[in-house]
Amino acid sequence: MTMQYINQTWLGKKVILGQTDIDASKPVNVLIGFHGAESTPENMLIHGNRLSLTNTVTVYPEGPVDAGNSVWSWWLDGPRQKEAVQQFLEFTSSMIDEAHRFMKEQNTANGFHTCLWGFSQGGAAALVYALMGKYPVHKVASICGFLPELPDITAKNEPTQILGIFGTHDDVVPSFLADHALDEMKGHGHTLSAKETPQGHEVSAENIQDLIRFFES
């Protein structure tokens, strides 16, 4: 199914919106895709454009942290990472507000589900928001994701369905870090489907098929 894409600006940040033919009588998935560190929405779109999804609006936002050279991150590593992750949570809640506003303008009679996915730091972003974000999410997928140092807040998000994919040959996010992050999510009551593959730090064709099955089920 062909996606039609448009560029918008939300919260002063670039957002690439994709939309299939929408059947407003059925629930719509709003799928937010988080790019990796020091990257762009366009790089995430390269992966996301391979997703053949029905009744879905895709949202590829630009990260809030300027990493220089026209690339962006969701937070910076370092001694103030807890504060940076807290700022990410607040930014993403505001971005979800914008996505909800957009969807309400589409007159979706039976509502919509907010879903998240991401690669690398984007996978971490999806997991962090599922764990500590303001708004509940319907489904979350992480490819080569991890958990950063988390802020000292006690608020927890509602449990959701999580697909976590990681590779034994990933030389950027070691498999033990990804596996630990997914165990943490399970320990907080989330329904977890974890898949270890022989891949490196990448989004493979097999990953794309797993994502399609997950979000279409």
Show where each model-derived region lies.
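Serine-hydrolase catalytic machinery in alpha/beta-hydrolase-like enzymes
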Residues: 6-109
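Active-site signature of alpha/beta-hydrolase-fold catalytic machinery across serine-
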Residues: 46, 128-132
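Flexible "cap/lid" loop of the alpha/beta hydrolase fold
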Residues: 70-77, 145-162
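Gly/Ala-rich beta-loop-alpha elbow adjacent to hydrolase catalytic centers
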Residues: 117-122, 126
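A conserved short beta-strand
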Residues: 135-147
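Short beta-strand/loop motif that positions the catalytic acidic residue
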Residues: 163-166, 170
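Conserved alpha/beta-hydrolase "acid-adjacent" motif
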Residues: 171-177
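C-terminal catalytic histidine-bearing segment of alpha/beta-hydrolase fold enzymes
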Residues: 179-217
